[in-house]
Regions:
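Terminal or standalone catalytic/regulatory effector modules within metabolic enzymes
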Residues: 1-173
Length: 173
């Protein structure tokens, strides 16, 4: 893939070679990331380099925010969560409520760190066809300026994959 191939070529390679079915706008963001690297290096990117760039840029990026522990409880209000998270080495625990687990964690992080964003895109799928397969979740958050930040999370537990995707999107703001 070179700088002329665009987002379609990058998305096609990630889907056909690695089984990643990125949301359309995330595919576009990945295409721009690949183009930037291709332009900077003055060379075509091979499929493995594209996959490595995806993992480095969008998958399970755990800094400066990270999640240490999460607990959920079903209540009359929805899902209540207690999230222990770390930002730049400082660990805090926050409780929040949401209409689902991901929404509850998102609300806890917003409350803990006064973050401003809206959860806009969520997509998930299995990476293999077996009961022991890992899942991948994709999350897109809209920043106050209207631009999107993206994250992906990979884990055998889809809830953990979703939380990791959210944290990566926050870290990519």
């Amino acid at each position: 893939i070179n700088s002329q191939s665009g987002k379609g070529g990058v998305g096609y390679i990630l889907e056909t070679k690695y089984g990643l079915n990125l949301p359309p706008k995330m595919r576009e963001a990945m295409g721009y990331a690949a183009k930037g690297v291709s332009d900077h290096l003055h060379k075509e990117l091979h499929p493995d380099e594209i996959f490595d760039l995806f993992k480095k840029t969008f998958e399970n990026v755990g800094q400066p925010y990270s999640i240490n522990e999460v607990h959920f409880q079903q209540t009359g209000e929805g899902i209540t969560t207690k999230v222990t998270s770390t930002f730049n080495g400082k660990t805090i625990t926050t409780e929040a409520v949401g209409n689902g687990r991901l929404d509850a964690v998102s609300n806890a992080l917003k409350k803990a760190y006064e973050l401003k964003y809206s959860l806009e895109v969520y997509q998930e799928h299995a990476l293999e066809r077996s009961s022991s397969s890992k899942a991948i979740a994709y999350v897109g958050i809209k920043k106050p300026d209207g631009t999107m930040a993206w994250g992906a999370g990979v884990d055998p537990d889809i809830i953990r994959a979703s939380i990791d995707a959210l944290v990566t999107a926050i870290n990519n703001r």
